[in-house]
């Protein structure tokens, strides 16, 4: 699997911003089939940083209603990546 297929997008929320500032931990939406080793290698290769730890979680999609029609958002996988001390990814600045 290509490293750019593994990492889909950063998850920018209030909680993830606090985790970044306090624990040097970033959150990404990743491919559901990717494992922790593949995620760590992809982050290291794309952003040229050292990854210490990867924690993953599968997020269930919410049920949404539009009128009579009931639909469901897709399930997705979230990866919380802890970077080495001193390492940082710049595109999160100012977000």
UniProtKB/Swiss-Prot annotation:
Any one Gene Ontology biological process term? translation
Annotated SUPFAM superfamilies = Ribosomal proteins S24e, L23 and L15e
Q: Which GO terms describe its molecular function?
A: rRNA binding; structural constituent of ribosome
Record keywords? Ribonucleoprotein, Ribosomal protein, RNA-binding, rRNA-binding
Which superkingdom?
Answer: Bacteria
One term under GO cellular component:
ribonucleoprotein complex
Q: What does this protein do?
A: One of the early assembly proteins it binds 23S rRNA. One of the proteins that surrounds the polypeptide exit tunnel on the outside of the ribosome. Forms the main docking site for trigger factor binding to the ribosome.
| Assembly and binders | Part of the 50S ribosomal subunit. Contacts protein L29, and trigger factor when it is bound to the ribosome.
Q: Which NCBIfam families match?
A: PRK05738.1-3, PRK05738.2-4, PRK05738.3-2
Protein family per UniProt: Belongs to the universal ribosomal protein uL23 family.
Q: What HAMAP family does UniProt report for this protein, alphabetically?
A: Ribosomal_uL23_B
* Official protein name in the record: Large ribosomal subunit protein uL23
* Species of provenance: Desulfatibacillum aliphaticivorans
């Amino acid at each position: 699997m290509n490293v750019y297929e593994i990492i889909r997008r950063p998850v920018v929320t209030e909680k993830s911003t606090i985790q970044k500032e306090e624990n040097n931990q970033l959150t990404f939406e990743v491919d559901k089939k990717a494992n922790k080793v593949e995620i760590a290698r992809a982050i290291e290769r794309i952003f040229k940083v050292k990854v210490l730890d990867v924690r993953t979680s599968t997020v269930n999609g919410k049920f949404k209603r539009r009128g009579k029609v009931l639909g469901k958002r897709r399930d997705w996988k979230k990866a919380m990546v802890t970077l080495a001390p001193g390492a940082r990814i710049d595109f999160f600045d100012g977000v």
